[in-house]
């Protein structure tokens, strides 16, 4: 029987959310990692949040009215990047469902004129790595999700460099210029959202920004001119947003510093890209998106 692919609608939210939760639970239990979606309620809430986001677009695949999987694609204007995820397929789904969803998402990304497409892959799920590789994605950066408590409270070894909130258009402009030097483009929308949420902060020395964070957490990103600046951003965050934050596994200095300050590695992940990619030459923290 043929598969149907169509946009996700509001009355699909609960079924898609439950499938996402079941899929993550099956993979995590098979490999001994904590589940990235701790409950069905979390999975349903995630789908509802993404469906309500005007910068996200979701599709599902079904057979005779039974939903088998879903996928989302996101844009972050003015960034040229489109992001894919989460891709979830029901554990009982047959082979080829994920490929159909990926193909449909990539077609949509190209229709929106995105030539840079990115995702964060869970390496515990080898099948997804194979799928993304066959779709043309390249592994760019192995990541660790670091979990722990804010270093701003209690006895710790946080950096003594000071930070202050990102406040005005001049601050935003300087942060965007630093971001461009790292990524090749700004992440202006995400930075402004973090400002609205009161979690964006920066380091400024001699009139120049040497680092900023759009929050410290799994949905946040940060860039810095040095590891000492990055330590200051992490160390001065009043809270860790979500289950933790991603750190490039190749940044031994930051990983070792975090471990020495009581953090633990939650699970590994991989940043993968399709299309043009500028490798960051300065320290950075990616988000769950990229």
Question: Where are the language model's segments positioned?
Answer:
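Conserved catalytic-core motifs of GNAT/GCN5-like acyltransferases
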Residues: 118-122, 138-152, 265-277
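Intrinsically disordered, low-complexity, positively biased terminal segments
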Residues: 9-10, 52, 56-58, 62-63, ...
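Glycine-rich phosphate-binding loop
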Residues: 96, 100
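A short beta-loop-alpha structural element at the N-terminal edge
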Residues: 4-18, 140, 161-174
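Active-site rim helix/loop that mediates acceptor-substrate recognition in acyltransferases
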Residues: 17-58, 63-72, 180-200
């Amino acid at each position: 029987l043929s598969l149907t692919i169509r946009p996700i609608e509001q009355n699909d939210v609960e079924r898609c959310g439950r499938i996402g939760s079941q899929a993550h639970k099956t993979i995590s239990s098979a490999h001994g990692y904590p589940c990235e979606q701790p409950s069905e309620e979390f999975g349903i809430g995630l789908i509802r949040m993404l469906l309500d986001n005007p910068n996200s677009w979701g599709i599902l695949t079904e057979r005779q009215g039974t939903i088998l999987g879903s996928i989302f694609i996101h844009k972050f204007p003015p960034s040229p990047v489109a992001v894919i995820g989460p891709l979830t397929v029901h554990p009982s789904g047959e082979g080829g469902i994920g490929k159909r969803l990926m193909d449909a998402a990539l077609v949509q990304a190209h229709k929106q004129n995105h030539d840079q497409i990115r995702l964060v892959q869970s390496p515990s799920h080898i099948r997804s790595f194979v799928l993304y590789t066959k779709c043309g994605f390249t592994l760019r950066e192995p990541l660790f999700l670091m979990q722990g408590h804010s270093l701003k409270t209690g006895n710790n070894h946080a950096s003594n460099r000071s930070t202050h909130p990102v406040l005005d258009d001049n601050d935003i402009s300087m942060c965007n210029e630093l971001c461009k030097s790292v990524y090749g483009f700004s992440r202006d929308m995400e930075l402004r959202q973090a400002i609205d949420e009161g979690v964006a902060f920066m380091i400024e020395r001699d009139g120049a920004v040497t680092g900023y964070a759009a929050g410290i957490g799994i949905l946040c990103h940060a860039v810095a001119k040095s590891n000492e600046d990055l330590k200051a951003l992490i160390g001065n965050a009043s809270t860790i947003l979500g289950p933790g934050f991603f750190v490039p596994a190749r940044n031994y200095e930051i990983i070792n510093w975090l471990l020495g300050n009581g953090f633990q590695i939650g699970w590994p992940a991989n940043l993968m890209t399709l299309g043009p990619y500028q490798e960051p030459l300065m320290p950075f923290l990616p988000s769950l998106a990229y």
